Amino acid sequence: MRQFLFLISVLFANTIFSNITVYFNYGVFSTSSNKPYLETYLTISGNTVKFSPVSGGYQANVNISWKILKGKDIVKDSKYNLMSPIATDTLHLPSFIDNQRFSLDNGQYTLELIVTDNTNPEKKSIHVEKINIALNRDKKVYNSDIQILESFTKSANQSLLTKNGYDLIPYNIN
């Protein structure tokens, strides 16, 4: 009986700790030329991915795979590696963020997101969500979504986090 309970607890623990913790959020915005786009925000919990030794400390490396489908057709897709900041202390592993923008027309979409730890490929997180892009261009005034920020600073260089001359760090953990 003890062996059975031990086996069940090991399998249960393995299931719990096998996924990467990813916080996902998005907003729908309009460009200055009134074209809608989807902006995505990811926060990857540093203590759920493997940090490997690199020059100057330890770093995690994850693969991000996006697919945006309209019906069964792939409208946008992207696959890239995202590196964490370098950590000098493995007791305090930093979370890290990603921000992407996808130009889309009005319509119903399905977003598929897969985040895989490149150091431990069995460890992954999968998210699928329906997204509605509906900006009415016939109206003179309409709303985009709002972006909740953790912080912002005047931008020294243009990056994925830059909007109108400021680096906007999204607050993504609710």
Predicted feature descriptions by range:
Residues Q3-A13:
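Sec-dependent N-terminal signal peptides
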Residues F17-N174:
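Intrinsically disordered, low-complexity terminal regions enriched in Ser/Thr/Pro/Gly
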